[in-house]
Every structure is written in structure tokens, then in C-alpha cells.
């Protein structure tokens, strides 16, 4: 294959995947600094930024950590960096962004003060505040704590992932270091009290750090910090575990237990630890000193999701939030619109756009299919389900009514594994057939097939979408869901489910583009048509909206199209490894990223000519 980028450093046109993701997360962080966004929504964006960063370190840095051990010389195909180089670049980038997060938190605290809400600084307390804090520590916190001494007689404890600790260096009689560690995950992250019509927020970590000396009696503290551990969460399942005689659900349960004890990939401190403490912890936790990151603001920012409800339980402060937006029900099948779902779909395709539309029409369709005598089976691929899922309940109801219900449930949906294990049990007990996908691929498709027998002929209702079958996230993500009785779509969906039941991937389709065999070749084919259109004097146009772009073959094809004169517009929310507007290569490529109230999640491809 002719090289598309022969005479230019690849780093000028391609971006490292991990650093591109960090730029995306920086865009999330920037929303928390936007004064036009309501206060509590800004706090939520800041919490999302830190939550994203936690997951990034657990998964992506965790994966690079593994690669640095197993394949230390493997290079990134876009920038030529090995795993160790990428980790160094990530840590440097994290340190560069940290002051921006600090500024965002300070701006939110300032606005909270303007709203008569104070984040207490324990170094500057009034006498009354001091009395309240002292009482809270003595009566509410101290009885629940279990301080631990770490020395030659007391072994180093296991430090759980994403949990914070007070770590203190205690005065020692010899040169050996003596530590005091106080776990406090069992305590609430903050305490709120009222004084003189002002609300005061007190962070548990700050209180414990302030009173640390009281926890260790006569042993004098030489230095003290809040510390937080991040562990690798990039578990992989060996394909041998899919053997016929293996209980894959049980294997995944054991893998989740293993995840909790994987290697440490990040150590966060509230202040700079001394050299002796750093060296001791790095040795015990087997991490490099460059994995120590400092943050003067709260290390665990998960409190930001719950704090708005604690401060305003009835949402009386309308100015603190985005205006309320309720999903619209375009067709209320349950109330007889269109003569019911199945009747309506005989004459109309239905395109739902979330979060603007409700998931109700799809749930109504499943419930109606459960009771319709013409329906033979319901087959569906499930990735992430909501708690108390109406969709799962509808599938269980259909099985209980005697329908054949096949659920392809992906147990490896990251951080939803346990939820999916629980749903697998529930669906099986209702009578559904549950299979767990393929050894080499995650089943990420959002596909549902309802098969009917009408006048001795097989007819299909097919739903294909970009979003999970999850009523909760459908109100937070922009997604598309297309429902049709198109026979070709139904036949393709049948092939997909038949292949999955055989442990295979579908290798040919007529209407649906199904990865890994049918999707990328079709994208390449249609871009090639636009290239040929331009070369024959016509105008070529490509529009792509996706979550991420990092596939080298597609990026090189887009560069080739740009060089041919094809106008290319892309909306890419997250990772984007292609630089637009590089002279001679991507001149005709324009890329935007949308970050806002809703998480952009729909995928759209438009090929205009050719």
C-alpha cells in the first residue's frame, strides 16, 4: 500500500491516542470554568473531569503499565512512542493541567461563598467553627476510625483502589521509618452545618489531617498528608476461559476480585511527601517516583455528584441547574397511538433521537411483542443496562409469556461487569437464553430483532441504535435508535445473531454494516467513491460523527480524500489522532468536538456524491 504521509514527520499530522484523550478531558474541565454554565452544573463537570481521569489511569495507564513490562519496545504507530514514553508524557500532561483544575475549584468555591456557602479552611476557623469541628471529630469521626502503625512489627496493609488515607511519618527511635495510616472510606466525605444563615462545608479528609496528632497519642508526627491510591483495572480474560466446560459468569466474578488487587499506577498526595516517605511507599507499592502526583484540592472528587442534592434537596435553586428537559414521547403506543407499536411499524419507520425522545416507544414495543401471538422470538444484544431496567423486565416478561428470548449479554462491559452478571442471572431465571459473546471481541452492537410469523411468512421488526439499552443514560447521552420492518435489515440481523450463537462474527451483510468484517471496508469503499467523484470533476463530501478517531487505515484514507479535494467535516467528541488543516495532507478536513450538557454519543456517516 502506498504510504500516504511519506515526507512529513508523522507527529505533525498524527496525535498520540492517550494525549488526545487528555485534551478531550481538558475540554470537559473547561466547562467547569465557564461562567455561563449554572453553578452546580460546573461542579458536576469538574467531578466528571476527575472521574474520567481516574478511569483513564486505571484503564489506559494500567494497560500501558502492563505493556511496558511485556512489550517494552512496542511503539505507538502514530508517534513512535513506547509505553514508558507514553506514561511519562501522560504524567507531564497531568501536572500541566492540574493548575487549571485548581483554578476551576477555586472559582466554584468563590461562587459558593457568594451563595452563603463556605468551604471551611481549618487553618482559619472562627472560635465557634473550631468548637463545632472539634465536637464533630470527637463524637462522629474518631469512634469509627482504626489508625494503624506501620513498622517492623506491623506489616504494610493492602491499600484499596480509589480510597483515601491519612498517612503520617511518626517519630522513630532508630533510622527505620515508622508510619501511621488512617483509612476513612467508611466516613461520609463531608459534613454540612449552619451558622448565622451561612452553610459550612467541612471535608472529612481536612478534619482528619488537622487532628492527626490526636490519633497517634504520644508518637509525634513529623509530616502528614492525605494520600490516594489508583490501581490498574485493565483486566483481560484469556480466550481459553470460553471453553465449553467453563462457567464464564463465574470466571468473570473471580476476575473482578482479581482487579481489586492489581498494581498501583498512581499515588496522589495533598502535599509534597518527604524523600524518605516517597522512597518507602514507592518500594512497598512498586511504583516509580514519577507516579506521585500532587493536588492541593480534594483528592477524591466523587462528592461533587451528591453535594448539590445535599445543599438543595428539593432543587429550589433553579438558577443552579440547567433548565429541566423532559424527553418527548413521539408515539405513545401503550395508549393506542398508531394502533399499537407493531401495527404502526408496518407502515412507518421510527427514528428516535435521545435524550430529546423517550425510550418509552421501544419499551412499549417489547411489551407488546411479549403479548402478540404472531411474535415467535426476541433477540437482543445487551451491553450496559440501567438499574431497575424496564427493558430487562420487558424481556423477562416476554420469556415468561412463552416467547423465545435470546440475550447476548456482554459481561466484559468495563465497570458494569457485576451489574451484567446480576442481570444474566435474572434473565435466565425468567426463561431467557443468555449467551456471553465471543472470545476475541466484545459485543458492542445495539441490535434487537423481533421475529413474527404472519400468514405463514416470516417478518421482522429490527431496531439498531448507537446507545445502550439504558433508560438512565438515554437521558444524558445523545443517541439514535432506528426501528424498521425492512426485510433486508431483519435478514442481516438474523445472520448476526446466528453467527453469535455459533461463536462467530458475521462475514457478509446486505444492509447493516457490522464490525469487525463489514464496517471498515464499507467506510473505505464509500470514501473511495468520493475520491473518484472529485477526480472525475465532481464534488466529493464526507461527514462523520463518532466518539473517537484513531484507526490508521481510515485516517490515511481521509488524508487521501482530502488530497483529492473531497470536503470532509467531522464531529469527534473524544480521541482524535488526526490533525486537520495540515498543508498538503489534511487541508480539506475540518474537525469539531462538542462538549456540553449531553454526552455526544451518536454515530453518523454521510457520503454525498459518487
PLM regions and their residue ranges:
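N-terminal localization/anchoring segments of enzymes in phospholipid and broader phosphate metabolism
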Residues: 1-542, 560-564, 574-600, 604-610
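Hydrophobic alpha/beta core scaffold segments
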Residues: 567-571
Amino acid at each position: 500500500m502506498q504510504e500516504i504521509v511519506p515526507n512529513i514527520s508523522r507527529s505533525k499530522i498524527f496525535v498520540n491516542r492517550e494525549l488526545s484523550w487528555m485534551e478531550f478531558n481538558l475540554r470537559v474541565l473547561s466547562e467547569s470554568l465557564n461562567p455561563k454554565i449554572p453553578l452546580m452544573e460546573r461542579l458536576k463537570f469538574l467531578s466528571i473531569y476527575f472521574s474520567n481521569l481516574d478511569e483513564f489511569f486505571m484503564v489506559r495507564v494500567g494497560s500501558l503499565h502492563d505493556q511496558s513490562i511485556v512489550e517494552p519496545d512496542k511503539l505507538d504507530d502514530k508517534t513512535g512512542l513506547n509505553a514508558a514514553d507514553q506514561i511519562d508524557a501522560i504524567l507531564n500532561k497531568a501536572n500541566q493541567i492540574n493548575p487549571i483544575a485548581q483554578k476551576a475549584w477555586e472559582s466554584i468555591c468563590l461562587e459558593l461563598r457568594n451563595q452563603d456557602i463556605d468551604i471551611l479552611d481549618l487553618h482559619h476557623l472562627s472560635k465557634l467553627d473550631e468548637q463545632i469541628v472539634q465536637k464533630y471529630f470527637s463524637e462522629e469521626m474518631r469512634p469509627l476510625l482504626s489508625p494503624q502503625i506501620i513498622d517492623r512489627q506491623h506489616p504494610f496493609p493492602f491499600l484499596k483502589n480509589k480510597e483515601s488515607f491519612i498517612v503520617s511519618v511518626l517519630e522513630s527511635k532508630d533510622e527505620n521509618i515508622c508510619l501511621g495510616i488512617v483509612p476513612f472510606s467508611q466516613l461520609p466525605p463531608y459534613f454540612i452545618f449552619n451558622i448565622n444563615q451561612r452553610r459550612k462545608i467541612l471535608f472529612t479528609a481536612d478534619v482528619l489531617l488537622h487532628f492527626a496528632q490526636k490519633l497517634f497519642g504520644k508518637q509525634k508526627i513529623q509530616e502528614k498528608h492525605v494520600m490516594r491510591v489508583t490501581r490498574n483495572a485493565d483486566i483481560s480474560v484469556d480466550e481459553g476461559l470460553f471453553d465449553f466446560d467453563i462457567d464464564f459468569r463465574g470466571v468473570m466474578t473471580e476476575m473482578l476480585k482479581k482487579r481489586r488487587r492489581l498494581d498501583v499506577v498512581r499515588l496522589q498526595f495533598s502535599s509534597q511527601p518527604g524523600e524518605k516517605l516517597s522512597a518507602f511507599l514507592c518500594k512497598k507499592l512498586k511504583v516509580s517516583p514519577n507516579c506521585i502526583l500532587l493536588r492541593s484540592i480534594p483528592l477524591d472528587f466523587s462528592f461533587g455528584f451528591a453535594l448539590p442534592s445535599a445543599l438543595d434537596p428539593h432543587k429550589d435553586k433553579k438558577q443552579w441547574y440547567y433548565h429541566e428537559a423532559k424527553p418527548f414521547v413521539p408515539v405513545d403506543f401503550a395508549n393506542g397511538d398508531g394502533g399499537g407499536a407493531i401495527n404502526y411499524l408496518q407502515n412507518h419507520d421510527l427514528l428516535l433521537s435521545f435524550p430529546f425522545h423517550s425510550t418509552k416507544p421501544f419499551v412499549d414495543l417489547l411489551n407488546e411483542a411479549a403479548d402478540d401471538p404472531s411474535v415467535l422470538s426476541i433477540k437482543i444484544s445487551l451491553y450496559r443496562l440501567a438499574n431497575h431496567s424496564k427493558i430487562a423486565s420487558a424481556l423477562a416478561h416476554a420469556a415468561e409469556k412463552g416467547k423465545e428470548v435470546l440475550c447476548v449479554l456482554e459481561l466484559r462491559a468495563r465497570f458494569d461487569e457485576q451489574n451484567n452478571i446480576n442481570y444474566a442471572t435474572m434473565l435466565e431465571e425468567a426463561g431467557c437464553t443468555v449467551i456471553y459473546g465471543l472470545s476475541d471481541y466484545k459485543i458492542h452492537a445495539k441490535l434487537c430483532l423481533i421475529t413474527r410469523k404472519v400468514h405463514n411468512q416470516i417478518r421482522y421488526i429490527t431496531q439498531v441504535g448507537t446507545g445502550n439499552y439504558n433508560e438512565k443514560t438515554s437521558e444524558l447521552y445523545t443517541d439514535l435508535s432506528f426501528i424498521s420492518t425492512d426485510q433486508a435489515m431483519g435478514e442481516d440481523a438474523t445472520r448476526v445473531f446466528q453467527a453469535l450463537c455459533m461463536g462467530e462474527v458475521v462475514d457478509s451483510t446486505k444492509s447493516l454494516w457490522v464490525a469487525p468484517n463489514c464496517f471498515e471496508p464499507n467506510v473505505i469503499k464509500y470514501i473511495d467513491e468520493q475520491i473518484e467523484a472529485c477526480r472525475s470533476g465532481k464534488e466529493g463530501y464526507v461527514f462523520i460523527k463518532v466518539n473517537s478517531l484513531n484507526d490508521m487505515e481510515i485516517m490515511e484514507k481521509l488524508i487521501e480524500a482530502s488530497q483529492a479535494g473531497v470536503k470532509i467535516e467531522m464531529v469527534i467528541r473524544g480521541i482524535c489522532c488526526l490533525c486537520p488543516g495540515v498543508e498538503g495532507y489534511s487541508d480539506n478536513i475540518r474537525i469539531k468536538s462538542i462538549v456540553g450538557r449531553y454526552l455526544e454519543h451518536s454515530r453518523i456517516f454521510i457520503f454525498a456524491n459518487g
